[in-house]
Amino acid sequence: MRTKISVLAAAVLMFSFASPAFSETCIAPEVMADGRKAELYFAFANCYTVKVRTRVKYPFEDARGSYSGAGFLIDRSLGWIATNAHVSSRNPESLEVAFKGKKFIDASLHYVDYLLDLAILKVSPEKIPKWGISATLACSDEPVVGSAVGAYGHPYSLSYSGTRGIVSGKRYRHGRRWIQTDAPINKGNSGGPLISLNTGEVIGINSATYSKKTSEGLGFAVPMYHACTLIRLLEREIDPSPSYIPISFAFDRDASVSDLYVAIVYRKQPVHWPLKVGDRVIALADDPEVEFENQGDLVHALRGKRNKVGLLIERSGKRETVFVDSKPRPKLITRVGLHVSGIVIGRQPLKDDELLNPDGLLTVYDVASASIGSQAGVASYNHLVSVDGRSFKDVDDLCGYLKKAEAKKEKVKMVTRIDKYEYRAQSKYGLHLMKPKNVKLVGPEAPENCGNGNMEADGEKEGAVISSARLW
């Protein structure tokens, strides 16, 4: 059972706005008069909310540039700060945080999960202000629709600002669950806490809003009860990354709850599940009362589980238990890509690769504007078919080859494939002649040198070409 991550603080809240470097002592809201709690929860949030800024130079499915958002301290002793994955990015060139009234300090990317839009940053605990405290997280219960909440952050650079609203609903969109709120969430709020104004607990992480041009009062936050599961696993040094799901499910758009009907079983994944087309996946065998409402529930239920896991299924009208392999996908922070001439290339393994990318071709993640690669006509999300007639399935090998061409100042011929309809085909091919420049491996944990073939293997794919060591 989930438990609340609690924190105790004492003394009186005190601000000194005469000096930019104010000091403050934080008070636990539970010692305040009931009538004042709601209005003082925002003041209390100053003690754990931070600014986050990041710079992305080599994007992995992100966007190049400088960005800012919010975050909040979840474990002072470990120096852990929670924010959105889209705030931290998958491969930040630089990452910094600042507590209120303090200068920015360096942070590192400890864990990132794009399915949940969650990132855990790490700072040196010694650099956290003495008055900084860990937020109290609502890990046990789902928020009640209609309950009062406040979104805190830095909207449009208006630092440490709060907005009020209610929990409007609970939604499942884009493969994950969301808390819906009418508390305004604007640019700069992302990654900040969504606070219960009844308890002072953080119930969610501000994440997204619908376009202001077409809607009003539609904001979304990552549920804290889901984020807490990942945090607990990380505290126990267990990888909480999503497991491989070698199944695609049929989607019924008219159903309010999507039963997990097996549409196809993939055979070339690192795990094999003994399911059949037409099976219905119901729940974990050891928790049959909690039935899955969508694929996100299944993914979340498998986090932290290893080896054999029992699934309750329905087959031909009868319920039975089958045992499936549970194995986490490689951590995003271990992913390594290649930069050449403004292009970022890497592996993008998908569960339906055996249908759409059976040869395991590398993928172009990003092409910088006005770069050599852009001028040559290379585009994002093209597949790399060959370089000078050679096929590369490993960015380390490709890096070594392009390094040699760069040293000789020779041009190379790249052939790429894009999934775009052409006469009697769903793919088109492009030929790109360009000179390699600034060839290097990139990623949070990328090696300095390439072409050595010394990257550790990260799990084999039966029936598929093995990619480089730590590529994701």
Stretch-by-stretch model annotation:
Residues 23-72, 76, 84, 92, ...:
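N-terminal activation segment of mature serine protease catalytic domains
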Residues 26-29, 57, 75-153, 157-160, ...:
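Conserved active-site neighborhood of the chymotrypsin/trypsin-like protease fold
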Residues 24, 85, 239-472:
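C-terminal recognition in membrane/secretory proteostasis and scaffolding
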Residues 48-51, 81-84, 142-155, 181, ...:
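Active-site-proximal beta-strands of protease catalytic cores
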Residues 197, 201-242, 424, 441, ...:
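C-terminal subregion of chymotrypsin/trypsin-like serine protease catalytic domains
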Residues 67-72, 134-140, 156, 178-196, ...:
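Gly/Ser-rich catalytic serine loop of serine hydrolases
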Residues 37, 64, 132-177, 211-218, ...:
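Flexible, gly/ser-rich surface segments that form the specificity/activation loops bordering the active-site cleft
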